């Protein structure tokens, strides 16, 4: 059994490439996407349809309902299940998606022992400043408005009595797949902008507004996934704050910002990745599986 990861910015063609390669290499797929895990979020997540998936076994798609918890721990458990299935059935494993934080946890590991995040008993800014005063080396790697990571660092401090640096020193990370080969899809900026624009138009045409109305009615706006790109802008449209043209433009702009963040993260975190355009990457991956 061989395994690898395919990454790239949103709308880069990761899903199509993974499906094509999986069909050629006797592989199953683990989705590396924090939105595809949710049932009933089909259009906003741009998840592959059942027809597109065909006979290829997928993990990480339609795993939980929007009001249910899913985080990096659940993802790592999914990885274990997917790998066990692949080994048992003599399949290869392709991990594909744009949630780089999950992939980083897979190749670098996370520390065990913490409960769920401790709720902040002060403002996000105050919590950041407190932690910065206690552990400058660790906190200067985190943006002050990064709510998830600030809350995680604060939880470490409140639950363990240790600064994050002290905690990780005493609780070293354990990686599940430290030597995972990572392949990254590259696009020229103008081409990626065009792909994002076309996908956004298709999402709206396919029923994004109706999907969002359904999700809000069934789950309210409380779940974290209701703040995802595509959904949050559609809620603004439904509130009468923006018109339909602005809805499209805003989704495109926010998706472009996401793509920029993903690109920066991938460059900074996965230094041993192989990056190329799709045709060349396809050949390199097929070659890897054939060795």
Regions found by a protein language model. Give the residues of each.
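Phosphate/pyrophosphate-binding catalytic cores of soluble transferases and nucleic-acid-acting enzymes
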Residues: 1-291
């Amino acid at each position: 059994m061989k395994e690898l990861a395919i990454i790239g910015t949103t709308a880069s063609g990761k899903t199509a490439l993974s499906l094509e390669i999986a069909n050629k290499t006797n592989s199953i797929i683990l989705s590396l996407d924090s939105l595809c895990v949710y049932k009933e979020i089909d259009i906003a997540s741009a998840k592959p349809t059942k027809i597109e998936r065909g006979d290829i076994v997928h993990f990480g798609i339609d795993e939980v309902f929007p009001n249910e918890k899913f985080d990096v721990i659940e993802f790592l458990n999914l990885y274990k299940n997917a790998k066990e299935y692949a080994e048992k059935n003599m399949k290869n494993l392709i991990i594909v998606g744009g949630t780089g934080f999950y992939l980083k946890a897979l190749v670098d590991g996370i520390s065990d022992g913490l409960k769920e995040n401790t709720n902040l008993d002060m403002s996000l800014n105050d919590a950041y400043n407190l932690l910065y005063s206690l552990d400058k080396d660790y906190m200067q790697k985190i943006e002050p408005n990064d709510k998830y990571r600030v809350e995680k660092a604060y939880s470490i401090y409140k639950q363990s009595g240790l600064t994050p640096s002290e905690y990780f020193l005493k609780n070293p990370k354990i990686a599940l797949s430290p030597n995972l080969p990572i392949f990254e899809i590259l696009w020229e900026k103008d081409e990626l902008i065009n792909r994002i624009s076309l996908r956004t138009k298709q999402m709206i045409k396919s029923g994004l507004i109706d999907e969002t109305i359904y999700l809000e009615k069934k789950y309210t706006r409380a779940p974290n996934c209701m703040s995802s790109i595509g959904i949050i802008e559609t809620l603004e449209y439904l509130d009468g704050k923006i018109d339909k043209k602005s809805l499209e433009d805003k989704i495109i702009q926010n998706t472009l910002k996401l793509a920029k963040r993903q690109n920066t993260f991938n460059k900074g975190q996965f230094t041993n990745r192989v990056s190329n355009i799709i045709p060349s990457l396809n050949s390199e991956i097929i070659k890897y599986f054939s060795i």
